[in-house]
């Protein structure tokens, strides 16, 4: 395998047999379905992500990593998400 900058390696297209490739394809599909089901049943994930992006676009921080760390460790965040979930239930 060829090594790329940053020590990443390119995938070897001949490394898997046809049966293994088919098994991998099915696994990827099942994983996507499971992820979609999880996200649809956990509204709080949507609110975490949309709130995070909204704050990024509004504040446009210079240091995204620091901003993300501060955002997701904010002790008020669970309450904000909880309140949003309550608003959603009332609106439904």
UniProtKB/Swiss-Prot annotation:
SUPFAM superfamilies found in the cross-reference section: Dimerization-anchoring domain of cAMP-dependent PK regulatory subunit
Secretion signal, residue range per the UniProt entry: none
Domain of life: Eukaryota
Pfam family, one: RIIa
InterPro entries xrefs: cAMP_dep_PK_reg_su_I/II_a/b
Domain (RIIa) ranges: 43-77
Protein name: RIIa domain-containing protein 1
Organism the protein comes from: Homo sapiens
